[in-house]
């Protein structure tokens, strides 16, 4: 069965680019999102997120009649579910969004449909989703019931793209295809090949789920090494960035760069999915998470020390000292604030500090709710002119262009080594 109509459930940082990629190949794409504001923006041919090159693709797709957004699922040949999968307070995976998405498409499923879960999920999530669908559509058969002969095919195909490069990597990167049966994998591969230039690498759904978790856990462990090294170097009076530069001259050493912690909806979340299912075995993965989650607390302590130094060297009261935090996003040059350590650091500073806390984030127009009323969103030049203590949290291009003489006479906490 060919794919004439494709529906993408969830029009966020992954879902919207995916929908746009299919629409750019002149497929009829229906994007579904519960956010009416996002739906309205997309239907105007605009985008509600910051992602280079995405805006033009969406504009052309909407104007060409190949992409439309709605809040209610409709009948389609294929469904891709790209909704959030956060963790609960105890670090257990929260599959509520996936369950809601599955139940929303169940009434419009037809024989021959393909359902793909893209959301990063714990091992077994695809089988669980198939169970939810089967429970709601007893008139159809699913892979766990009928194998290769199932009426509905189901697969797990994780995204593996870099924010800021999504429209390139979505097309160029290889794709892991984890069907519940070989037929499911074959159909999922055929769907992605509509726009994919990379290779479709086929496996089963459980291995595909674990592959995504493994990729992000590997990165988290390596970042934890760099972050722990930065703590050690601070105690020893060593420039960690110079140290890493020298160590990386070894042909078999490639240490990553330290920072204020780890953010985003993948690396800061996914390792916990492994830990939750394998608490006795995943000791290194758990420790890496604890190291990276602890780094923001260390940064706040450095800011407190800088304020103390400022007070000792000036005649200002604490309430007169202004602190400027540079960056809120979880990585450079994007507007995505999910799980960003910079957000928590700015919030902690503002709650502790009796003076004004300025925030500079060139990729947003207003402060998120958790900072509204605590901080002041400021322009770059104004913050540089007013602040006594500068806190570098995200190495946006605008910040890397700041001349050294603009910061060298200040009290500086540089978590990214931009002003070293």
Swiss-Prot record:
UDP-N-acetyl-alpha-D-mannosaminouronate binds at residues 160-161, 212, 216, 219, 250, 252, 263, 330-331, 416. Pathway: Bacterial outer membrane biogenesis; enterobacterial common antigen biosynthesis. It catalyses: UDP-N-acetyl-alpha-D-mannosamine + 2 NAD(+) + H2O = UDP-N-acetyl-alpha-D-mannosaminouronate + 2 NADH + 3 H(+). Keywords: NAD, Oxidoreductase. One of its GO terms (biological process) is enterobacterial common antigen biosynthetic process. NAD(+) binds at residues 13-14, 33, 85, 126, 338. Its EC number is 1.1.1.336. One of its GO terms (molecular function) is oxidoreductase activity, acting on the CH-CH group of donors, NAD or NADP as acceptor. The active site is at residues 212, 266. HAMAP family: WecC_RffD. Catalyzes the four-electron oxidation of UDP-N-acetyl-D-mannosamine (UDP-ManNAc), reducing NAD(+) and releasing UDP-N-acetylmannosaminuronic acid (UDP-ManNAcA). Homodimer. Belongs to the UDP-glucose/GDP-mannose dehydrogenase family. WecC subfamily. This is UDP-N-acetyl-D-mannosamine dehydrogenase. It comes from Salmonella typhimurium (strain LT2 / SGSC1412 / ATCC 700720). The gene is wecC.
């Amino acid at each position: 069965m060919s794919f004439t109509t494709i529906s993408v459930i969830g029009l966020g940082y992954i879902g919207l680019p995916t929908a746009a990629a299919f629409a750019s190949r002149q497929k009829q794409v229906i994007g579904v999102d519960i956010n009416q504001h996002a739906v309205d923006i997309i239907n105007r041919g605009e985008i509600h997120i910051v992602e280079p090159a995405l805006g033009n693709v969406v504009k052309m797709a909407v104007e060409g009649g190949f992409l439309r957004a709605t809040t209610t699922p409709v009948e389609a040949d294929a469904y891709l579910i790209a909704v959030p999968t956060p963790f609960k307070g105890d670090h257990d995976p929260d599959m509520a969004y996936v369950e809601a998405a599955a139940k929303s498409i169940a009434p419009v499923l037809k024989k021959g449909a393909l359902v793909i879960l893209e959301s990063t999920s714990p091992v077994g999530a695809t089988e669980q989703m198939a169970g939810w669908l089967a429970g709601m559509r007893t008139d159809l058969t699913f892979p766990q019931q009928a194998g290769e002969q199932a009426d509905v095919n189901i697969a797990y195909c994780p995204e593996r793209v870099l924010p800021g490069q999504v429209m390139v990597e979505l097309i160029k990167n290889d794709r892991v295809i984890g069907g519940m049966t070989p037929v499911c994998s074959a159909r999922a591969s055929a769907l992605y090949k509509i726009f994919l230039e990379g290779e479709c690498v086929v496996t089963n759904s459980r291995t595909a789920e674990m592959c995504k978790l493994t990729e992000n856990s590997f990165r988290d462990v390596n970042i934890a090494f760099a972050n722990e090294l930065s703590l050690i170097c601070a105690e020893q009076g060593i420039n960690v960035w110079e140290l890493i530069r020298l160590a990386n001259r070894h042909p078999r050493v490639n240490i990553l760069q330290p920072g204020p912690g780890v953010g985003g909806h993948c690396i800061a979340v996914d390792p916990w999915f492994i830990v939750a299912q394998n608490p006795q075995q995943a000791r290194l993965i758990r420790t890496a998470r604890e190291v990276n989650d602890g780094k923001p607390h260390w940064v706040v302590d450095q800011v407190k020390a800088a304020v103390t130094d400022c007070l000792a060297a000036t005649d200002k009261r604490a309430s007169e000292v202004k602190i400027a935090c540079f960056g809120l996003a979880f990585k450079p040059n994007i507007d995505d604030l999910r799980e960003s350590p910079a957000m928590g650091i700015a919030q902690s500073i503002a709650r502790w500090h009796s003076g004004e806390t300025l925030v500079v984030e060139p990729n947003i127009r207003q402060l998120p709710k958790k900072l509204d009323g605590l901080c002041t969103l400021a322009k770059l030049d104004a913050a540089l002119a007013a602040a006594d203590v500068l806190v570098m949290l995200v190495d946006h291009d605008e910040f890397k262009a700041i001349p050294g003489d603009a910061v060298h006479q200040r009290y500086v906490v540089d978590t990214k080594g931009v002003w070293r």
